Amino acid sequence: MITAEKHPLDNCQLFVQLKKIFHDNNEQAKCLKDMIYWSGNDEHIEKICDQVTDLLEEHDLIIQPPDTMDPFAMNQLRGLLVYLVLNTAHDYFLCKSQWSANVMHLCNQLPPIPLFLTIAIAVNCCLMEPLEEFLACGPRWLTIQYFEAFNEALSVINSDCVETLPLLSAALRAAGRAIVNCNLPAENKQLLRQIACMEHRHILDSKQRLHTLPRPSTRKIYLAKAMDHLIEVLLYTLNDPLKREKPNCFAVYSQITEDISDSNSSDPMPDLRHFAQILLDVLQRIFQLVSVDTYMYWHEMKSKSALYNCQELICRQTAELLKVLQSDKLLGEHPVCKQMQSFADAAKTLEQRVAEMRMGELLVFLDSGMATDEELLAGLDNLFSRFIAFGNDECVETMANHLIMLTKKHAQIILSFLGQVVESEMVVEDEGISVTEVNQGDDEDETSSNDDYEELLSLVLRPLFMQLNVEDKMEVLLLRDEQNVTQGFNFKAPDHRERRIRFFNQLDYNKRFPITKFLVLCFENARQTWIDFSHLGVTHTRFSKLFWHIAQSCPKHAAFHISACADNILVNEQLLQKPYALQFTLYLYGHRQILNGLYTSARQLCVSLKDGRCPYGEDELRQAQNRFLDACAYGLAKFIEPMNLPSLQLILKLLKQISLGESNLITRGTAELNALEKEHPKLENGDDAPAVKVAKHYTYLNASLPEWRLKHWKLISHVMKTIDALRWDLATFEDFRVDNLELAVWYWQDGLSHLTFLGTECRQRILNQVNSLKHKGFWLIYLKEDTLKDTRSFLKLLTQSSAQEANDLFNKLLKKRADCAVMGDLSDAVVKVNSESAFMAFRFLFREYLIAFRSHAKHNKTITKRQHWDHLMAVVAKAPFSIRNEIMKLASKAFAVRFGINIQEQQAAKC
């Protein structure tokens, strides 16, 4: 055996062995040049054909079924046919120098072969497909001789009129394609005459000629076969002939000789219509021979289609052909169209035919191996429309056997069905009955309904998903999300976790992102895959950009899972301490705006105010915000109990950034809306332009974010609990704790401190929350028109306050001229506690006092600078003795120059 050559016109062992066969026959049997006629040489022709067949079998070039043949092996057969053609004695022969240089090395290797012998070898030695290609693609001066010889030899090759029809069809198909592949008007006329002659000679299209067949049944079969072949040739020829590209094999046959044509028309349709009219004339004469008895006989005949009987197949083919003919003005006027109409009216579409089949019949049909691709697709579509099939092992096996025919549509059908299963389970659970209880009530041995579809997922849906392209994979994932299928079904592969970890460990942002592998991981567990991806996003800005780039490539799918990323990160201590955690989580808060689309303006990314790739409405935006704020609340609750200050700080900073970001979003959105209103004036009826309407919609939604956030009770309550837990006293003071308290109080005061304007119900809800807190003082100030009446109440609040709160309290004390007394009481309390934390607290509060004192001195012009300084020194004198010098330095540094005080002179005077 030899290996099939990639280049069919290369010399090879097959050609060497074929050369020996012909030379041996020429020398030992009969000289080939003496074989002028087929008649009388039948035995020699048969012997040579048998020898060639044996040779092809030896090289595994004759394979059953032929559609499994390797493309290289088919190229070898094409090369073999060209080899025979180059060594055939032609009536119109070019001189040696006129053969193409590409084939010169193959010429004159064999004794001159009679042309009819070449045709006999092609027909009898499985070279009919290459012969048809050669007739369609070869040089016209050469192929016309083969059409003529084929016409002469056809009845000799096979005397059975029915069996010659496939050979005749092959020649007719080749003629139709030849007109398109190499459009030579003059040569086309010669070819059309040859085709008309061939049909007249070999098709029994009159009653007299039909009756040369001995039996009525044979005549009925012949009419059916003849109509079938003629209609197929017409459909093959007329179905978008100009849109079909030349086959790859065209280069093999067209390079036999140089192009010697002197004319080449750009429009083959006139000659192609002429060709079709010749066939339609014959078809018309055959239609006239079809009686009612013949038509009914066809109903009992099997056809080449496993789906239709002969009558149904002809009616369907007729309907298809009539549609094609009517699309062409000239061909649609042919008289045969009227004859075809009654057949077309009786036609059943593939969809109608498979719908008539019982489930068992449908499965047998699909698994028979006899259906065409078109029939298989119709049958599979029908099988997928019968939802009972999804839980049946035999049906699932049939689906799995035809995976190559399945498309995104079939995956979506499965997911829609599974979505209905999940929905029905939820309804049952809502009624107080679990699915397990229902199944156990029917049959204790049955598994849950989800197990019933395990094979459907593993044998059909998963491999089907794998073979889809990236865009289709994204659409399938989105539908699964929309149908909530993952709530009821497990898509994980056994090794999913290991592959997911390995994927992200090996991910390199400098290399092309492996999107296909990523989507496969999403198919198996989308939520955890996106969560793991977000873990990289908090580590480095480049991973963050990569995360959002991929999310924006499948925004609607990503929108279903990004909230889970926030849920995970905001309760994970390690992730919150990553360098990019704050910025990344802020992006997670605005993921709906990001996924809808961003644009660049003045070198800054801005939120788009139009429907982008992931439009959203109020419900979607509010749901996303609520879930994110829930995650923030859970994070605060988790980290406040162990007093995890670093994690608390990040969440509190995040809340502050959210507040600032919303303000910026509203400002920019308003500016963009104003610009759009100038660019798109109102319509004549007074309505806003469409672009302005959409922009107003998104501007309104963005402007609603702060209001919705400030009404989020879970976050409100946990912020209150966080503030309460962060309150300090002289024994527990530390700077980091106060920094966190400052952030929490800032968030409260930024919006929630205006609770005096809230309704009674909301105020009462917060009052109830306050009653459960340890430190109630500041909340009572926020909630009631309360006044601080004595120094003790001031001192109590000061020793638990944030920086801003302390500043506000000192301002009030300065106005009341009670600051000196309170600072004295504070000093006494610090000395009593006598701990490092107490002294740190005094330093902190004194710094805030200095800030308040600066404002007081600036606005109180009735007192001289010296008087202000003396007052400040009186307060400094109240400081604990151990840190009084340090406090003095702070005061001097802040106000000595401002008040024109010479510290050295003052110290000398004291001495």
Swiss-Prot record:
Subunit structure: Component of the core survival motor neuron (SMN) complex composed of Smn, Gem2, Gem3, rig/Gem5 and one of 3 almost identical Gem4 paralogs encoded by Glos/Gem4a, Gem4b or Gem4c.
Disruption phenotype: RNAi-mediated knockdown targeting all 3 Gem4 paralogs (Glos/Gem4a, Gem4b and Gem4c) is larval lethal.
A GO CC annotation given for this chain: SMN complex
Name used for this protein in its record: Gem-associated protein 4b
Gene of this entry: Gem4b
Function: Component of the survival motor neuron (SMN) complex that catalyzes the assembly of small nuclear ribonucleoproteins (snRNPs), the building blocks of the spliceosome, and thereby plays an important role in the splicing of cellular pre-mRNAs. One of 3 almost identical paralogs (Glos/Gem4a, Gem4b and Gem4c), resulting from a genomic triplication, that have some redundant function. Required for neuromuscular function and organismal viability.
Species assigned in the record: Drosophila melanogaster
